[in-house]
Amino acid sequence: MGVIRTIKRAVIKRLKLIYKHYRYKIYFPKLYRQCCKDNPVQENKILFLEMRFDKLSNSMEYMYHVMEESGKYELATAHLHFNFSRGREFTENVKHMIEELATSRCVILDEASIVLSCLPLRKETMAINLWHGCGAFKKFGR
């Protein structure tokens, strides 16, 4: 009985890794390229990407309000709820983020994002990471 359980766990673990690879390396990049093909970049659009929570962090919220008051930018937000949502809910959150990102000139985030790092950002799109961690753990846009 123990051998079967061990094999079952190993198979499930391997299937989860295959699914994760497919989602991040194939599905999300393909969806992003499709959205980019169908929509041009809006020069004044800025996307604020929050990885975990329902609202923007303090520094991002302040930047959002300052930019909103200036009236110069079209602002959008995306909340992925990373580690708090699973399956379809997370995929729907990422789809929304990708749709917004495809037309954004700039994306601002405050921590590392596995989702953003797997996407082939357009040359016109700039990623700004406000996270204060060391550079080895960051991936910046063009």
Regions found by a protein language model. Give the residues of each.
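Membrane-proximal basic amphipathic "stem/tether" segments
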Residues: 1-44
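Active-site and donor-binding regions of nucleotide-sugar-utilizing enzymes
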Residues: 45-142
